[in-house]
């Protein structure tokens, strides 16, 4: 019989040290029996115990970040291309069946598994789907 439940979680950290909030949240995922893989482009020195590392360039080349710029706004906001890149990354990750996407700042309160035959997403406000959680 095919197993339809999973605890596999994937997420992304572009570069630099992991912020305290993200460290706490990643540790909460591990503490609640999630199989966490953190995709990265540069070495990470403060990884929580139990989090696995994977090469993010196997999912999406970082050079795409240089091509993502805001077209409508005259002012340059360096966070916009990063957010857009992250959106592309998580969608491609889903296409490659790498598990439930959780942003690094999602805190887990209790253990769970998810059904591989269902779709999951986050509802953010009136009529808007958010991307902190997606499968």
Feature names for model-found ranges:
Residues 34-42, 131-134:
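Active-site-adjacent helix/loop patches that line small-molecule binding or acyl-intermediate pockets
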Residues 1-20:
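N-proximal low-complexity "stem/linker" segments adjacent to membrane-targeting elements
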Residues 5-11, 29, 36-38:
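Hydrophobic targeting segments
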Residues 81-129, 134-135:
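GT-A fold catalytic core of metal-dependent nucleotide-sugar glycosyltransferases
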Residues 5, 32, 49, 129-130:
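Residues that flank catalytic or metal-binding motifs in active/ligand-binding sites
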Residues 17-31:
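Short, well-formed alpha-helical segments that are part of the catalytic scaffolds
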Residues 39-45, 107-111:
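Short, polar loop motifs at secondary-structure junctions
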Residues 44-88:
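Active-site-proximal specificity loops/subdomain of glycosyltransferases
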């Amino acid at each position: 019989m095919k197993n339809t439940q999973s605890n596999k979680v994937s997420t992304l950290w572009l570069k630099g040290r992991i912020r305290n909030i993200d460290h706490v949240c990643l540790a909460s995922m591990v503490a609640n029996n999630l199989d966490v893989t953190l995709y990265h482009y540069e070495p990470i020195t403060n990884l929580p115990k139990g989090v696995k590392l994977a090469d993010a360039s196997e999912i999406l080349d970082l050079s795409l970040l240089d091509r993502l710029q805001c077209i409508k706004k005259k002012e340059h906001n360096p966070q916009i291309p990063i957010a857009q890149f992250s959106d592309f990354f998580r969608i491609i990750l889903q296409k490659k069946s790498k598990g439930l996407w959780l942003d690094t700042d999602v805190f887990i309160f209790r253990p769970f598994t998810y059904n591989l035959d269902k779709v999951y997403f986050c509802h953010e406000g009136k009529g808007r789907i958010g991307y902190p959680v997606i499968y």
